[in-house]
Amino acid sequence: MKIIFFLCSFLFFIINTQCVTHESYQELVKKLEALEDAVLTGYSLFQKEKMVLNEEEITTKGASAQSGASAQSGASAQSGASAQSGTSGPSGPSGTSPSSRSNTLPRSNTSSGASPPADASDSDAKSYADLKHRVRNYLFTIKQLKYPESLDLPNHMLTLCDNIHGFKYLIDGYEEINELLYKLNFYFSLLRAKLNDVCANDYCQIPFNLKIRANELDVLKKLVFGYRKPLDNIKDNVGKMEDYIKKNKTTIANINELIEGSKKTIDQNKNADNEEGKKKI
């Protein structure tokens, strides 16, 4: 009886362990597939071809904003003048309609004026609305993944997308974009290594696109474990510092040569001035 009870408890433990492992395996695969799609979409969106914002749209929006402000100030001045003329002179329909027409005509011209078409040769330039829609949809998808530290950077990028000048800074600088793609790629590599550890010894089947091949194992280790060993990193940093110092030495030498040359020129000019002064005396 005790043996049967022991066997039942042992079987229950094995089944429960397999269920937990299967659930974690399924979650890992789902996360990895979503991350893989996000990484590929990000690279095709930002790095396959450079985003080019229509420059004429930026200048047109800036000009329309300035003309709108001047139109409002002109309208307020004209309405004040018409109010004064209405109080001093006779009131009538002819005293109000010209001012109202003069107030409405400039506004209609500035607001209804369409932006000029983009240059036909600049075929890569896209409108702000189109690029903003694509980038915002991608950032909202990233936020739904809920990977570690997945809120601050996408929220910051979404804030930049709200303004055309901030959006131009975002796509021209590429600092935030590169940081986001790096984090996504790093997290994908980390979960991929975890999945291969979970499915070690053929315990579970790894999807073909998520398997770690022998030729990429070293690269993945460098990526996950901090780009090689700390000693190699220190050697690289020392080499970079030496190159930096050498460049600075050459720069300092060139600056000293310029200083010496300028001193000689100043001394020669002083001597020439002194000789001319002596001749005049």
UniProtKB/Swiss-Prot annotation:
Bias kind Polar residues: ranges: 101-110
Domain of life: Eukaryota
Signal peptide: 1-19
Sites carrying sugar chains: N109, N248
GO CC annotations, alphabetized: extracellular region; plasma membrane; side of membrane
Keywords, alphabetical: Cell membrane, EGF-like domain, Glycoprotein, GPI-anchor, Lipoprotein, Malaria, Membrane, Merozoite, Repeat, Secreted, Signal
Recorded topology in the membrane: Lipid-anchor; GPI-anchor
Bilayer-crossing regions: none
Entry keyword annotation includes RNA-binding: no
PTM annotation, UniProt: The p190 precursor is cleaved by SUB1 prior to merozoite egress into 4 subunits p83, p30, p38, and p42 which remain non-covalently associated. SUB1-mediated proteolytic cleavage occurs in an orderly manner; the first cleavage occurs at the p30/p38 site, followed by cleavage at the p83/p30 site, the last cleavage occurs at the p38/p42 site. The order of cleavage is essential for parasite viability. SUB1-mediated processing is essential for merozoite egress.
Biased composition (Low complexity): 63-100, 111-120
Description of how the protein assembles with itself and partners: Forms a complex composed of subunits p83, p30, p38, and p42 which remain non-covalently associated; the complex is formed at the merozoite surface prior to egress from host erythrocytes. Forms a complex composed of processed MSP1 subunits, MSP6 subunit p36 and MSP7; the complex is formed at the merozoite surface prior to egress from host erythrocytes. Within the complex, interacts (via subunit p38) with MSP6 subunit p36 and (via subunits p83, p30 and p38) with MSP7 (via subunit p22). Forms a complex composed of MSP1, MSP6, DBLMSP1 and DBLMSP2.
UniProt-recorded name of the protein: Merozoite surface protein 1
Native source species: Plasmodium falciparum (isolate NF7 / Ghana)
